[in-house]
């Protein structure tokens, strides 16, 4: 039976994951801070994180289900659908190759507060620069992307293996720098998240399969539902926001949050020694 405090922890972390996973502000840093504040850690937390990340990506699948069906059923007779699928697979492959080769090394040597904070601040500065530079739009819709756009964004996504970089942040900034409109860059980031995050969740789920215990099912289910709902809210809100605003607000938030993380480490406010990513 799940007690009130455990239910509260599951809901809070589900909300944090759902709201931050697809915003360019690094869900990793937020999860570590909040989990430490509410005392949710250990092996159970590692398994729980896999579940709520899977819920977040399924929210995106649901939100873009019409486009997904259009592409799937158009593969046999629509060049546009085949080109989009090819671009998605091309952008996905660099993360697969580099992830398999370097994921464990990165988690061992780079998962620390200094790296997370530096990645947040540097990413924020680059985001400000990308927004303020003259932006020549070559692609206004994801269906019009060329393979070269997809491949470059795929390599940029690999930077998100560095904790604090933010997967969505790196792909969105990359899209803007390579000539995509804000809408196209954001939507392609969402679509690219589907195979990337599902693949990562399956890999992590298999690697840490011994951590999943039947008694944790109620906690996992509550976190899953919460993460799903708030991820959907975040995705819809972001798409509406970028229609009339730049990413500057997120950039400044990253910089401030990065400095805050440095403070939590410097003054011992958060126990970073138990962080697993």
Curated annotation (Swiss-Prot):
InterPro entries: UppP. It comes from the Bacteria. Keywords: Antibiotic resistance, Cell inner membrane, Cell membrane, Cell shape, Cell wall biogenesis/degradation, Hydrolase, Membrane, Peptidoglycan synthesis, Transmembrane, Transmembrane helix. Its EC number is 3.6.1.27. The keyword Coiled coil does not apply. It is found in: Cell inner membrane. The keyword DNA-binding does not apply. One of its GO terms (cellular component) is plasma membrane. The chain crosses the membrane at residues 44-64, 86-106, 110-130, 184-204, 215-235, 250-270. Pfam families: BacA. One of its GO terms (molecular function) is undecaprenyl-diphosphatase activity. GO terms for biological process: cell wall organization; peptidoglycan biosynthetic process; regulation of cell shape; response to antibiotic. Bacitracin is thought to be involved in the inhibition of peptidoglycan synthesis by sequestering undecaprenyl diphosphate, thereby reducing the pool of lipid carrier available. Catalyzes the dephosphorylation of undecaprenyl diphosphate (UPP). Confers resistance to bacitracin. Belongs to the UppP family. This is Undecaprenyl-diphosphatase. It comes from Pseudomonas putida (strain ATCC 47054 / DSM 6125 / CFBP 8728 / NCIMB 11950 / KT2440).
């Amino acid at each position: 039976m799940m007690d009130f405090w455990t239910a509260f922890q599951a809901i809070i972390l589900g909300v944090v994951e759902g709201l931050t996973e697809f915003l360019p502000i690094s869900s990793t840093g937020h999860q570590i801070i909040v989990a430490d504040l509410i005392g949710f850690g250990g092996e159970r937390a590692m398994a729980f994180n896999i579940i709520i990340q899977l819920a977040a990506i399924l929210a995106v699948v649901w939100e873009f289900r019409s486009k997904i069906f259009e592409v799937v059923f158009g593969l046999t007779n629509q060049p546009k659908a085949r080109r989009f699928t090819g671009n998605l697979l091309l952008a996905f492959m660099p993360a697969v190759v580099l992830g398999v080769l370097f994921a464990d090394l990165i988690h061992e040597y780079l998962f620390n507060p200094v790296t997370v904070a530096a990645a947040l601040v540097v990413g924020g500065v680059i985001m400000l620069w990308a927004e303020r530079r003259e932006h020549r739009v070559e692609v206004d819709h994801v269906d019009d992307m060329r393979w070269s756009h997809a491949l470059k964004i795929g390599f940029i996504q690999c930077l998100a293996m560095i904790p604090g970089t933010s997967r969505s942040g790196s792909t969105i900034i990359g899209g803007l720098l390579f000539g995509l409109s804000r809408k196209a860059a954001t939507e392609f980031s969402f679509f690219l998240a589907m195979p990337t995050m599902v693949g990562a969740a399956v890999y992590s789920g298999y690697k840490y399969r011994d951590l999943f215990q039947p008694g944790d099912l109620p906690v996992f289910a509550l976190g899953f539902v919460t993460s799903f709902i708030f991820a959907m809210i975040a995705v819809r809100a972001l798409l509406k926001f970028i229609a009339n605003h730049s990413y500057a607000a997120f950039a400044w938030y990253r910089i401030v949050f990065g400095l805050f993380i440095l403070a939590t480490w410097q003054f011992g406010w958060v126990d970073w020694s138990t962080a697993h990513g």
